[in-house]
From Swiss-Prot:
Gene field: mukB
Parts forming coiled coils: 326-418, 444-472, 509-602, 835-923, 977-1116, 1209-1265
UniProt-listed PANTHER family: CHROMOSOME PARTITION PROTEIN MUKB, DUF4476 DOMAIN-CONTAINING PROTEIN
Family to which this protein belongs: Belongs to the SMC family. MukB subfamily.
UniProt-annotated stretches for the region Flexible hinge: 666-783
Protein name: Chromosome partition protein MukB
SUPFAM superfamilies: P-loop containing nucleoside triphosphate hydrolases
Length: 1488
């Protein structure tokens, strides 16, 4: 016998009046007595709070504001607590003898809302010796203690070995533990269950008949037939699911092509774009690499062009500089030629003028001599004319004087005066102041002698003059020549200078004779020098082009080396073309081979995909076509074996289904006809009577009744005898047993129970031995157990059958796949991998391209070397003949030397040309320069002075002679003597005068003629002199101009200048031609550089754009790949055969698929939106999202309970395998699961009958309950009329309403609701749906009406209402009802809890003083009979002789309020003893 769990004690910590109080609870009744305010309600409130710690339910009305419903109001709990931590704990012992302490920690929350914080907890494994108060309090001293917090309590319990502490965050977990450990009678899963439990406790606490419970007695008393309801729901759900599955299959069958089309088009749409992006990414990578290679190549080309540009710019600069210098040189040469030509013309002029000057010089000299002679003759004529004139004048004067003396008497005076005048003139002329007429004669002789002397001297001087004049003219001429040649010099230096000039002239003539040879030599040397300079320039250019400096001695060896290199390079170039041709031919062959393989690769890939699918499906690896055909044979054999096994499993499954169907019949009837016969006979199946038999008793009763376990129990066998006549629709053996179905027992047999068997004595001579069946099916529990095992077996069989069917279908499809593979791909599937060959060939192609590039580079380099070698040889060919010139290091010095000698010779030639004539003239007369002939000028002056002296002497002599002649005049006083004495004189004077006049005339005529002639001669001389001077001046000017020109005007100068100019012109033309070539090349190079720069910028831009595109695409591609791998669709999207299609073909493929997809998803808003978003070409990941969305959509559309994969493609493939099988199976399953209205009515009726029987059993326990005038209490259960009509229609008239139950659009619940509305149109169903109403109609509790009736005095049975009963009667009646509810809960929960646990039973009763002693005794008896604990409260002791009584007295001590408690056990024969712990229990409270 399982002991019932009990509450041991209630502990209050820090409650109002109770600091640390533990109430030991009696096993039956615990009474709390005391006056008002003693703490009875507080104690019960603490118990209820620990039992149901739900603040939404707790409501202690006796201390709460009346009518208050607000959640913020005090529900009566806040005022019962004291400040700080409070506890309420229940100490229990369950049926397993486990001590469990459950309780709550309470604490007031500060604020005006007066709220309380509650934390439930549980303690397991606590030793019996530990009191609850010891756990939550800490003793400080003898009079003080402290309450521990929950955390401290946890820490304290953690230190205790074997003690478990649990704190709960939800009330559901708290109540679940209490239910599992047997503390409460019902599992409180929800707030509704807690509310029912609280209403039960509340009704018990406050007593009376609770309207909240009586109105809903069905919920409290009638257990929810969850099994039946769940069976109905499962069956209906299975049917609904079956129908939905069938409909889904039909829809899937109809949409299968659409799904295939959707998957195919979505795969084409996304895979084409996926592979296009993959191809484009590879192409972009290749393009980026190509761009980078081309970029590097262009950079190298640009660098080479820049170097070339720099070289050409430098060379152009050199040529520009050289052109400037050449232009200057050419201009200088042209100017020099012009100057030479000008100088030549000047020289011709000079020579012409020099010839003219020489001729003029000769003529001038000749004319000068003529003029000199004419001048001498003129002087002589002048002297002769003057002398004649003087003689005429003297004679005229003499004659005049004489005539005057003769004519006039005064002639003496005149003569005397004339004598005096003559004396005076003589004195004056002779400078003789002492001259007298007497001394005149003496002086006359003297002066005549002097005159004679002067005349002789004059004649001598005239002779010298004549001689000196000739010498002087020669000297002057020689001196003038010397001065003209040498320049101004002293006359004394003329001889020395003339000799030097003559010696120098000889040297200069010698040098001048060397001008032409020197000039020819210089021209030759200059030509060689120019050739040497040209050779040096060529050598410098050659070294510059070769990039190395070479010695002259190395050039011949280098020439031979270059010729050898040219020969080898020409051979290499000629062989390179053949090698290049071979490489290109191999490259073309590789390209054609690659094209062929690329055309074959998609076919091979399709074959490989098919082969891989076959390998995945069969799990085998195939390496040859023979293995494929062998495996196909194995597949056929496996298919035959699987079909055989499937049929066997199907047969066994059908048998199990039939057995399950048989065991699932209502009431346990294995034959449907038994139910009809039981209704016909008005009896009950024996199996239905024993439907509640436990699983342990099922074998016994099954063996007890044996074959009659399917008998029908009827009240009277005699009444059905007539009905047995003609009975055909029945089992072969029909057992009928007479008995009361309501009180049937097994006393009809005499039974002896053996070990696992019974012996039934049917009659004196007939016994039946029956062993306990190993699988009993008698009783609902046994049937359910068997059905459960059968269901498990059926599940295994169904799974096995499904697996085998699937395997068969799979094998058949695999066979078809193998057949298709053999027909389509077997010929190519096992060939070599074309992609590997393509990769190998591509590698070889890359090697060939690299080799071609290297070959082109080498060939280009060889060509460049060949050209360089040819240029080098050409340059050397020009250089080698000039090696002697290059080796001649003294050539420039010799040119300078010859140039200097030529300059000297030309200078000498110019000197000779200029002064040769003067030197030639000077040479014969150089001797005259040895001495200056007395200085001819001085001689001329002496001659003039002597001439003057002779003239003066003549005049003096004449004057003296006149004085002497007139000496008589001084003594004569008259002239008569003179006239007479000189008459002859007059005549002589006249003759002489005539002669003198004639001489004078002749002299004058000669003088005039000579003067004219002299004038003419002088004019000719002057003109000659003027012409000479002019030409001399012009000559000097020309010579100065020639000197200013500064060139040598020789005969070869013009030719050399012209040759030099022509050479410079040729060099300038060549330089300009080269410069133009360089400019063109430079322009072309600059254009090439600009093109390369633009190309480089474009390449850099394209490369950066491509690289950025690659990087961006890589990020997007990584996101796409991540999305693809995360969603596992890479295998679907990475279709290698698409890699061989072009981007346009893939784009066309994707566009075609897009058009098809738009039509396919036109009715699906989500897929349509995702497809529209996926059309963005910049967001390829959205296409993956669309593909995933399509797959997700297909996963949602395809039943996952039918298909064993998440891959829609595989699901469709599997579904094609399963469709026909599932359709047939689900159709048969629907037929099996179909619910008949009659069976539903029977199930509901049987359930109602069973519950009615259970209520009758409960009523038997209440028959002896009496309170006051109430003699008995019972529950009356009736079926509602509307629902009874519904059951009748379901049983008898279901054919009239088959339109509802045969409709595929309505579930059975909905059809049941429609039928109920059709039968009861007057009832308003409100807003409830037919499904909800139908589910309510499937719950048998809604068919019943329950009410409590009491048998009160003379009134008999009447409905229990508070108004018709006294307070005590109502309390007793209500307590009886609550006991029934608790017992009902235990029966209902027995299947949910362990079989070894009997839960605690405890109720409350406050204000129990309203019951009389008889009613109290009845309560005590009821508690004893039902093993129930009861806590009652009353102002006074109502029954101290039974149970445990606590006397509570509230006291105030030193301003501290506490409750004094005294506990007494019930009276017994021995003296009553005080309960342990009650003497000192107030100490903590008082201490507080």
């Amino acid at each position: 016998m399982i002991e019932r769990g009990k509450f041991r004690s209630l502990t209050l910590i820090n409650w109002n009046g109770f600091f640390a109080r533990t109430f030991d609870l009696d096993e039956l009744v615990t009474t709390l007595s005391g006056g008002n305010g003693a703490g009875k309600s507080t104690t019960m409130a603490a118990f209820v709070t620990a039992l149901i710690p739900d603040l939404t339910l707790l409501h202690f009305r006796n201390t709460t504001e009346a009518g208050a419903t607000s959640g913020s109001r005090d529900k009566g709990l806040h005022g019962k607590l004291k400040a700080g931590v409070c506890y309420s704990m229940l100490d229990t012992i369950n049926s397993r003898h486990q001590r469990v302490v459950v309780g709550v920690r309470l604490q007031q929350v500060a604020g005006r809302d007066r709220k309380v914080d509650i934390k439930p907890f549980a303690i397991q494994g606590l030793p019996m010796s530990v009191q609850p108060t010891q756990l939550v309090t800490e003793t400080l001293n003898e009079r003080q203690a402290r309450v521990l917090s929950l955390a401290e309590l946890k820490d304290k319990l953690d230190e205790m070995e074997g003690v478990q502490f649990k704190q709960f965050n939800s009330i559901t977990d708290y109540h679940s533990l209490m239910f599992d450990l047997g503390i409460i009678a019902r599992r409180l899963r929800s707030a509704s269950d807690r509310s029912k439990f609280y209403r039960l406790i509340e009704a018990s606490l406050y007593g009376g008949i609770s309207s909240a419970i009586t109105r809903s007695l069905r919920d409290y008393l009638l257990p929810e037939n969850s099994g039946v309801r769940k069976a109905f729901q499962d069956m209906e759900a299975a049917l609904r699911e079956n129908r939905l599955t069938l409909e889904a299959i039909r829809v899937t069958q109809s949409d299968r092509d659409l799904f295939k089309h959707l998957i195919s088009e979505a795969t084409d749409y996304v895979a084409a774009d996926y592979m296009r992006h993959a191809n484009e990414r590879r192409v972009h990578l290749d393009q980026a690499l190509a761009f980078r290679r081309e970029l590097y190549t262009s950079r190298k080309q640009l660098a080479a062009e820049q170097y070339k540009h720099v070289d050409m710019a430098r060379e152009l600069g050199e040529h520009n500089g050289a052109e400037g210098s050449l232009e200057a040189d050419y201009q200088a040469a042209s100017d020099h030629l012009n100057l030479v030509q000008t100088a030549l013309r000047q020289q011709e002029k000079i020579e012409r003028y020099e010839a003219d000057l020489e001729e003029l010089q000769i003529r001038f000299e000749e004319q000068n001599e003529v003029v000199a002679e004419a001048a001498e003759m003129q002087d002589e004529n002048e002297a002769r004319a003057e002398a004649a004139e003087l003689e005429v004048d003297e004679l005229k004067s003499q004659l005049a004087d004489y005539q005057q003396a003769l004519d006039v008497q005064q002639t003496r005076a005149i003569q005397y005066n004339q004598a005096i005048s003559a004396l005076a003139r003589a004195k004056e002329l002779c400078h003789l102041p002492d001259l007298t007429p007497e001394s005149a004669a003496e002086w006359l002789d003297t002066f005549q002698a002097k005159e004679q002397e002067a005349t002789e001297k004059l004649l001598s001087l005239e002779q010298k003059m004549s001689v000196a004049q000739t010498a002087h003219s020669q000297f002057e001429q020689a001196y003038q020549l010397v001065a003209a040649i040498n320049g101004p010099l002293a006359r004394s230096e003329a001889w020395d200078v003339a000799r030097e000039l003559l010696r120098d002239g000889v040297n200069q003539r010698h040098l001048a004779e060397q001008v032409q040879p020197l000039r020819m030599r210089l021209s030759e040397l200059e030509q060689r020098l120019r050739e040497q300079q040209e050779a040096e320039r060529l050598l410098a250019e050659f070294c510059k082009r070769q990039g190395k400096n070479f010695d002259i001695d190395e050039l011949e060896a280098l020439h031979q080396e270059l010729e050898a290199r040219i020969a080898s390079l020409s051979e290499s170039v000629s062989s390179a073309s053949e090698q290049r041709m071979a490489l290109r031919q191999e490259q073309e062959q590789l390209q054609s081979r690659i094209q062929h393989l690329m055309q074959r690769a998609p076919v091979w890939l399709a074959a490989q995909n098919s082969l891989n699918q076959l390998s995945e499906q069969c799990g085998e690896e195939f390496t040859s076509s023979q293995e494929v055909t062998e495996y196909l044979q194995q597949l056929l054999e496996r298919e035959r074996e699987a079909i055989v096994e499937r049929d066997e499993v199907g047969a066994r499954k059908n048998a199990v289904d039939e057995e399950i169907e048989r065991l699932s019949q209502p009431g346990g009837a294995e034959d449907q006809r038994l139910n009809a016969l039981a209704e016909r006979f008005g009896g009950v199946l024996l199996s239905e009577i024993y439907d509640d038999v436990s699983l342990e008793d099922a074998p016994y009763f099954s063996a007890l009744y044996g074959p009659s376990r399917h008998a029908i129990v009827v009240p009277d066998l005699s009444q059905i005898a007539e009905q047995l006549e003609g009975l055909t629709d029945c089992p072969e053996d029909l057992y009928l047993i007479e008995g009361d179905p309501q009180s049937f027992d097994d006393s009809v047999f005499s039974v002896d129970e053996l070990e696992k068997a019974v012996v039934v004595k049917i009659a004196d001579r007939q016994w039946r031995y029956s062993r306990f069946p190993s699988l009993p099916i008698f009783g609902r529990a046994a049937r359910e157990n068997r059905i459960e095992s059968l269901h498990a077996e059926r599940e295994v069989l169904s799974e096995r059958f499904a697996t085998l069917s699937f395997d068969v279908q799979k094998t058949q499809r695999l066979h078809q796949a193998f057949s298709r593979f053999i027909g389509s791909h077997l010929s190519v599937a096992f060939e070599d991998d074309p992609e590997a060959e393509i990769r190998r060939l591509n590698g070889r192609r890359v090697e060939l391209e690299r080799a071609l590039a290297t070959h082109e580079s080498d060939n280009q380099q060889q060509r460049l070397q060949f050209e360089q070698a040819k240029e080098g040889v050409s340059a050397l060919n020009r250089l080698l003949p000039r090696l002697n010139l290059l080796a001649d290091e003294t050539l420039a010095d010799r040119v300078d030397e010859i140039q200097e000698r030529l300059d000297e010779a030309q200078e000498a030639a110019r000197f000779v040309q200029q002064y040769g004539n003067q030197l030639a003239k000077l040479e014969p007369m150089v001797s005259v320069l040895q001495s200056d002939p007395e200085q001819f000028e001085q001689l001329k002056e002496d001659y003039a002075w002597s001439q003057q002296m002779q003239r003066d002497a003549r005049q003096q002599a004449f004057a003296l002679a006149e004085v002497v002649e007139r000496r008589a005049h001084f003594s004569y006083s008259d002239s008569a003597e003179m006239l007479s004495g000189n008459s002859d004189l007059n005549e002589k004077l006249r003759q002489r005068l005539e002669q003198a006049e004639a001489e004078r005339t002749r002299a004058r005529e000669a003088l005039r003629s000579h003067a004219a002639q002299l004038s003419q001669y002088s004019q000719v001389l002057a003109s000659l002199k003027s012409s000479y001077d002019t030409k001399k001046e012009l000559l000097n000017d020309l010579q100065r101009e020639l000197q200013d020109i500064g060139v040598r005007a020789d005969s070869g100068a013009e030719e050399r200048a012209r040759q030099r100019r022509d050479e410079l012109h040729a060099q300038l033309s060549n330089n300009r031609s080269r410069r133009n070539q360089l400019e063109k090349a430079l322009t072309f190079c600059e254009a090439e550089m600009e093109n390369l720069t633009r190309k480089l910028r474009k390449l850099e831009r394209d490369y950066h754009e491509m690289r950025e595109q690659v990087v961006t695409a890589k990020a997007g591609w990584c996101a796409v790949m991540r999305m693809v791998k995360d969603n596992g669709v890479e295998r679907r999207l990475h279709r290698r055969e698409l890699a061989y299609l072009s981007a346009d073909e893939l784009r066309s493929m994707s566009d075609k698929a897009l058009g098809a997809l738009r039509l396919a998803v036109a009715d699906n808003e989500h897929l349509r939106d995702v497809l529209r978003l996926s059309e963005d070409p910049k967001r390829p990941e959205r296409k993956i999202q669309f593909f995933v969305a399509v797959y997700q959509h297909l996963r949602e559309r395809i039943r996952q309970d039918i298909i064993r994969t998440d891959d829609p493609v595989e699901a469709i493939e599997q579904m094609e395998i399963e469709l026909s099988r599932l359709t047939e199976e689900l159709t048969s399953r629907e037929q099996k699961l179909a619910i008949s209205s009659r069976s539903v009515a029977n199930i509901i009726r049987k359930t109602i009958q069973r519950e009615q029987n259970r209520i009758r059993m409960l009523n038997q326990g209440l028959q002896s309950v009496s309170f006051g005038q109430v003699n008995s209490v019972r529950l009356n259960v009736n079926v509602r009329e509307t629902h009874a009509t519904l059951l009748d229609v379901l049983s008898e008239q279901q054919e009239q309403h088959q339109d509802l139950f045969n409709s595929n659009r309505l579930t059975f619940s909905e059809a049941l609701a429609k039928l109920y509305q059709r039968l009861n149109p007057q009832i308003d169903m409100g807003q409830r749906t037919p499904q909800t109403i139908g589910e309510e109609l499937l719950d048998y509790r809604n068919y019943l009406e329950m009410e409590v009736e009491v048998n009160r005095g003379s009134d008999g049975w009447l409905r229990a209402e508070s108004g018709a009963l006294s307070t005590g009667e109502a309390i007793g009646t209500g307590m009886s009802i609550l006991v029934m509810v608790v017992q009902s809960w235990e029966d209902e929960a027995r299947r949910l809890r362990g079989k070894d646990i009997s839960p605690c039973r405890l109720l409350f009763l406050d204000e129990a003083a309203r019951l009389d002693a008889r009613s109290i005794a009845t309560l005590f008896e009821l508690c004893e009979r039902l093993q129930m604990q009861l806590i009652i409260a009353a102002p006074e002791n109502i029954s101290p002789e039974k149970g445990t009584t606590y006397k509570l007295v509230r006291k105030v001590f030193q301003n501290t309020e506490h409750v004094h408690v005294v506990g007494l056990r019930g009276f017994a024969p021995q003296l009553p003893e005080t309960l342990p712990g009650t003497q000192a229990e107030d100490t903590p409270s008082e201490a507080s």
